[in-house]
């Protein structure tokens, strides 16, 4: 893997929570590369450091030590305004609980942040928003408030918002954690489609069925990358075999 095809490079990342005595380690020397166009899943038991890793590599939290580069930019070298802009334009986010403003429609919740993040004219951004709403099957819900749609529909709106500025990488943090099995499948179908279009995707999940969609899975234990498994490209035809392979591997790790 060369620097030119690496979207995310994390080197010797450490994170300590110094509010405790002695300090509690969150990350302990993590090295991670994500290639352009790759779908990577991060797994691990509760408290293994999955969420801490995502917060640090996305720039939402600073590491105690180590280095993070996204799109060739060193996060430590960016000022607050630059880091904020990076998170709006270079990175897309899909969280377990979608963070939308209750007084705005689905369309405006996607449109307004994008207008702040991009120099494009409103007409161009709106066209992009409408295209994404249609692509993910929620164009008929665009004028509704977030309280009027289901959890799965809201997550598809989150995916639209994550993609509207055409980011280099999308971070999905337990995006199906509060959904039923059918809706989980629909959201994962949408994320798999996003990856199929060439978008780099990093998924944090506790669900092996979701992780089986990824090309590569890394396993965190006590803040360290403990193991890694390559699955290759996902297809519907091989889904059951992939899930079985991944479950067997995870069982061997004590998951």
Predicted regions and their residues:
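The feature captures the beta-strand-to-loop junction immediately N-terminal to the Walker
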Residues: 43-45
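Conserved ABC transporter NBD signature motif
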Residues: 66-74
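Conserved ABC ATPase "signature" region
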Residues: 73-74, 122-141
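Short coil-to-helix segment of the ABC ATPase nucleotide-binding domain corresponding to the Q-loop/switch region
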Residues: 104-113
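Conserved ABC ATPase signature
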Residues: 145-149, 153
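Conserved catalytic motifs of ABC-family nucleotide-binding domains
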Residues: 166
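Catalytic Walker B motif of ABC-type/P-loop ATPase nucleotide-binding domains
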Residues: 170-173
């Amino acid at each position: 893997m060369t620097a030119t095809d690496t979207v995310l490079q994390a080197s010797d990342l450490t994170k300590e929570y110094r509010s405790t005595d002695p300090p509690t380690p969150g990350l302990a020397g993590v090295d991670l590369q994500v290639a352009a166009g790759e779908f990577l899943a991060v797994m691990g038991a509760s408290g293994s450091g999955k969420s801490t890793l995502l917060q640090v590599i996305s720039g939402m939290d600073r590491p105690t030590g180590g280095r993070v580069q996204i799109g060739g930019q060193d996060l430590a070298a960016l000022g607050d305004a630059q880091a904020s802009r990076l998170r709006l334009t270079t990175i897309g986010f899909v969280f377990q609980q979608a963070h939308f403003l209750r007084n705005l429609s689905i369309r405006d919740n996607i449109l307004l942040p994008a207008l702040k993040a991009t120099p494009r004219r409103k007409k161009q951004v709106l066209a992009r928003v409408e295209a994404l709403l249609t692509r993910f099957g929620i164009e008929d819900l665009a004028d509704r408030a977030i309280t009027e749609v289901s959890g799965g529909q809201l997550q598809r709106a989150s995916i639209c918002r994550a993609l509207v500025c055409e980011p280099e990488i999308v971070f999905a943090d337990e995006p199906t954690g509060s959904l039923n099995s059918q809706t989980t499948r629909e959201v994962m179908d949408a994320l798999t489609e996003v990856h199929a279009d060439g978008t780099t995707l990093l998924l944090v999940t506790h669900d092996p069925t979701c992780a089986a969609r990824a090309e590569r899975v890394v396993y965190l234990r006590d803040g360290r990358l403990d193991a890694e498994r390559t699955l290759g490209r996902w297809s519907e035809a091989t889904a059951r075999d992939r899930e079985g392979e991944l479950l067997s591997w995870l069982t061997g790790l004590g998951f």
